[in-house]
Amino acid sequence: GCGNTSIPNPSTMHIGIDRAGTVTLYSGALDIGQGTNTTLVQCAADALGLEMSRFRLVWGDTALTADAGKTSASRQAYISGNAVKLAGEDLRRQIIRLANVGETAAIEFGDGRLVVRDGDAVREIDLAALAPVRFDDVLVGEGMFDPPTTALDADGQGKPYGTYGFAAQMAEIEVDIELGTIKVLRVVAAHDVGKSINPIQVEGQIHGGIAQGMGMALMEEYIP
């Protein structure tokens, strides 16, 4: 809302690998049903070039996770998603540098080691030989994303938010003018979502918005 206008709105994420080869995404983002946990693991897997099943997720534990800000208005997908992407890219750069291979190299996991393949070249990183740098993790990538904004000037012009949502909704209803009852016959929702990370979750979010809108309009006696 207006309280966020032109102020910092960052999220910080960490991805770590321990000596056993466990890959952990540390997320302070709160999933309240919108599917953030799945979406952020998708972002991490894409950034590192790994399968989603490789990741362990630690979330909602303030002793282990950095601040990711509040969960509202699809904020976590945009802001924390970018933070996870940066963390994954940071970790991948560290692995590539240790293995002394090219940027397109593939990362695989052996028994307590990383196997990095770059064409015919194969390098191994012994994880047990590395010292922990954060908790039990011997390799850690960090990403912080804060949407670029500018303060409003005296004329109210500027860029107070990093991105915006665009949508249109139409509802066809039936009204019993004698009883005063309303029946929703059909709702059409059109949303410009940009690049969809998880299309099924996006559709679920739209359905949820429709349900909330119907509730506010018909049942909550809301007076704006």
Where are these regions (language model features)?
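Cofactor-binding beta-sheet edge motifs in enzyme active sites
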Residues: 1-224
